[in-house]
């Protein structure tokens, strides 16, 4: 059996992406009213999370998703594993495969780590474990893009034809890359707004419009996705000061007033309140930040189902 993976948002067809969004809604409905939030969908499956970067939302939501589906979830961190003794990622992956893991969920600072993991653990008669990319360097974060798309669909009633403005540190953002690819697949119009220094080389080849003027883009926006400036990936010199960046690219009360009443504000977290987004905006009725977190659990349930069981019987399994 060839294992199913989720390594990049661009690997998803339109039909697969929509099926995952639909399955996420089904799993959410299947849990409504249950005193014990448990579905038998993945009983007997072992899911291992491998987080080599700090995380709250993604790590916790994957763990909750697995447990709500009755999987056995094992957490592996760099500090608590043989990696701290010098073991390579490849040897760790092969060890987990030999131990019987059905799925490996990886977050790693190196771009391409998830695809390497899938290659390293493949090639045996059983096909190896499924690999899910929970964020690799500045490359991709496909489950974040899926939960963002689900949130937009829930708030706006659909994605196709919607104008989504992504603002901030595009250069270092795996969230931006995955959202661009997935939203394009689902028929949205994507606009990137950032200073020239925070745009990647080759962005002209992406299926997007690029702007440096946030005020000009907000009135026509259906959704605005604000990104954190990733100072941990910078050596300085990308913009003059935090104050100037916030003045030019922060979503303030004044800028929120430029949005249509239907528009939704998103942020993948963690938020730098007062820098890229004002606290009053983050806590407003137009903000879907907490809805994104809730959707993250349901999307990751759907993704685990997709890679471990398959899409064809999601409705039957989800309702079990």
Curated annotation (Swiss-Prot):
Q: Which reactions appear under catalytic activity for this entry?
A: carbamoyl phosphate + L-aspartate = N-carbamoyl-L-aspartate + phosphate + H(+)
Name of a matching Pfam family = OTCace
A GO CC annotation recorded here is: cytosol
Note the InterPro entries from the entry.
Asp/Orn_carbamoyltranf_P-bd, Asp/Orn_carbamoylTrfase, Asp/Orn_carbamoylTrfase_sf, Asp_carbamoyltransf, Asp_carbamoyltransf_Asp/Orn-bd
Q: State the protein's purpose.
A: Catalyzes the condensation of carbamoyl phosphate and aspartate to form carbamoyl aspartate and inorganic phosphate, the committed step in the de novo pyrimidine nucleotide biosynthesis pathway.
Family of the protein in this entry: Belongs to the aspartate/ornithine carbamoyltransferase superfamily. ATCase family.
Entry protein name: Aspartate carbamoyltransferase catalytic subunit
Organism field: Mycobacterium marinum (strain ATCC BAA-535 / M)
Q: Show the taxonomic lineage.
A: Bacteria, Bacillati, Actinomycetota, Actinomycetes, Mycobacteriales
């Amino acid at each position: 059996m060839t294992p199913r993976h989720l390594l990049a948002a661009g690997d998803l067809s339109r039909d697969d992406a929509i099926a995952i969004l639909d399955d996420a809604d089904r799993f959410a409905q299947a849990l409504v009213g249950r005193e014990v939030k448990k579905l038998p969908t993945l009983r007997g499956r072992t899911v291992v999370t491998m987080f080599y970067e700090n995380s709250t939302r993604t790590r916790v939501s994957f763990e909750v998703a697995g447990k709500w589906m009755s999987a056995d979830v094992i957490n592996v961190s760099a500090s608590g594993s043989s990696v701290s003794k010098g073991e390579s990622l490849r040897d760790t992956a092969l060890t987990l495969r030999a131990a019987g893991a059905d799925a490996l969920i990886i977050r790693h600072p190196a771009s391409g780590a998830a695809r390497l993991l899938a290659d390293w653990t493949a090639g045996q008669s059983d096909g190896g474990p499924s690999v899910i990319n929970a964020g690799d360097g500045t490359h991709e974060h496909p489950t974040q893009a899926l939960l963002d798309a689900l949130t937009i669909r829930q708030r706006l009633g659909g994605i196709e034809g919607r104008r989504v403005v992504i603002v901030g540190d595009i250069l270092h953002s795996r969230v931006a890359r995955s959202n661009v690819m997935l939203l394009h697949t689902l028929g949205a119009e994507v606009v990137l707004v950032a200073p020239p220094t925070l745009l990647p080389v080759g962005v002209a080849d992406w299926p997007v419009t690029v702007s440096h003027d946030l005020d000009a883009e907000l009135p026509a926006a259906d959704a605005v996705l604000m990104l954190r400036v990733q100072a941990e990936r910078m050596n300085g010199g990308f913009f003059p000061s935090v104050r100037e960046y916030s003045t030019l690219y922060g979503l303030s009360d004044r800028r929120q007033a430029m949005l249509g009443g239907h528009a939704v504000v998103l942020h993948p977290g963690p938020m730098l309140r007062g820098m890229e987004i004002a606290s009053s905006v983050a806590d407003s009725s137009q903000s879907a930040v907490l809805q994104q977190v809730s959707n993250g659990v349901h999307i990751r349930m759907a993704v685990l189902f997709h890679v471990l069981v398959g899409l064809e019987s999601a409705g039957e399994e989800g309702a079990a």
